[in-house]
Amino acid sequence: MDARALWQRYQNWLYFHEGLGLYLDISRMRFDDAFVESLQPKFDKAFADMAELEKGAIANPDENRMVGHYWLRNPDLAPTPELTQEIVQTLEQIEAFAEKVQTGAIHPPRASRFTDIISIGIGGSALGPQFVAEALAPDFPPLKIHFIDNNDPAGIDRVLNHLRNSLASTLVLVISKSGGTPEPRNGMIEVKKAYAGHNLEFAQYAVAITSVDSNLDKLAKDEGWLARFPMYDWVGGRTSEMSAVGLVPAALQGIDVRAMLDGAKEMDDATRVPDVKNNPAALLALSWYFAGNGKGEKDMVVLPYKDSLFLFSRYLQQLVMESLGKEKDLDGNVVHQGIAVYGNKGSTDQHAYVQQLREGVANFFATFVEVLEDRQGPSTEIDPGVTSGDYLSGFLQGTRQALYENHRDSITVTIPQVNPRTVGALIALYERAVGLYASLVNVNAYHQPGVEAGKKAAASILDLQTRVVAVLQKEKTPISLDELAKKAGASDQIEAIYKILRHIHANQRGVVLQGDLHKPGSLTVSAS
């Protein structure tokens, strides 16, 4: 296709949202009109499915749940007046709490103000808040946020050591839907111990964001924590940024959460239009389906050309992969669906993996995210008439062109600036695109059985560790791994036992491994 034909295709397929100033360009995806026409019946069903979802249908049949994250930014859509009122009241409570913390009306016992936040959560309870904090927090926020989003002891220590001199003015958010997920529970226990070590009463610094009557909710109530905010069973972790999960940390940092909700609502209105060409989420779903042949055959590479959006790819990684990566479809057929997502930021990526994108395996499609406003205020000219922002824009356009010339397809999303409205709109755009695409390929986008399987497997390893240590404590002399496995009733789990013992030994926790480390089967083990 020559340059003039490409320019016409660009105009034909360009979507523009005037209220948000958002552009979506899918002209560099090489589908034709016949392909679009062939998908129309699937889209008709997808639009109908989405309409029923928003009305309160059981859109997550595997867990028998409604899916209501769209109600969070438009409470009037909720299927009952009680839900509408609860959503409105929760938002008002979040804003009131944030204001009291920022003004010092709520303050720690030993300081006039809270200065920092530790946010403890994992998965959707971390990725959304991290993305929004990086994108939107002011340079000097009223409270500076720090995340504990893993079970890595050294990572926890790093956060706590950084806050050693300001722990007495640090608020703690504990975010866990079930209240029993191991990672946030363990993080809370570690942080609680650190506060006790500084003679600080944890309850006077703690906030729970969890399901009503969960174990965490009961603990927070019994201990008299500063506040408790609800999580709903009809909001999944990966779509929870517009709930208390995302709004509490955002509001505390001084981010305009109403504007973020307004941007999401405005995008929701646009993506509710039952017309593929005039619905930006449908255009994304169409492009994804074309790129991967409806089977996820190509990866999605996300390249935001803005430092503040560099966590967008990690956020989308969970949203897309946890939603679409399913073994079975809604009819029980084995389909192994999904789209792999990765990325970092431009133009850094041009000096990293874009070499392979341009000349290597063509197993991907790119998504460029462009921000029109370079910075607040004027820019210095690097060369006559050229700023650093011009260079960044040129790098994006050049990479897009270079990929297309070598038969690599791409999508470009353009926003006027990074602000709460546009970030809310981006989140809503991709939430809807995921839902529509899931309908196109007939999978449940709102459950995660693979995650649950991993949790169960991890629990079985910890149970095995308890049994193995109990056997060792009774033994008087070193024994082989084979013998230990037999006595622990786990003869078929020798490798797992070896790895458990290697870890305990490395941390000097009462286990001694002896023998040739090159030959694990020759080792003997004893309690020290």
From Swiss-Prot:
Reaction equation(s) it catalyzes: alpha-D-glucose 6-phosphate = beta-D-fructose 6-phosphate
Q: Please give the Gene Ontology molecular function terms for this protein.
A: carbohydrate derivative binding; glucose-6-phosphate isomerase activity; monosaccharide binding
Q: Which residues form the active site?
A: E322, H351, K455
Q: Where in the cell is it found?
A: Cytoplasm
- Listed EC numbers: 5.3.1.9
- KW Isomerase (keyword) present: yes
Q: Name one GO cellular component term.
A: cytosol
UniProtKB keywords: Cytoplasm, Gluconeogenesis, Glycolysis, Isomerase
- Residue ranges spanning the membrane: these are none
**Pfam families reported in the protein's UniProt record:** PGI (PF00342)
Single Gene Ontology BP term? Answer: glucose 6-phosphate metabolic process
Give the pathway annotation: Carbohydrate biosynthesis; gluconeogenesis; Carbohydrate degradation; glycolysis; D-glyceraldehyde 3-phosphate and glycerone phosphate from D-glucose: step 2/4
Function, as annotated, reads: Catalyzes the reversible isomerization of glucose-6-phosphate to fructose-6-phosphate.
- Report the family membership: Belongs to the GPI family.
Q: Which NCBIfam families match?
A: PRK14096.1
Name-wise, this protein is Glucose-6-phosphate isomerase
By which gene is this protein encoded?
pgi
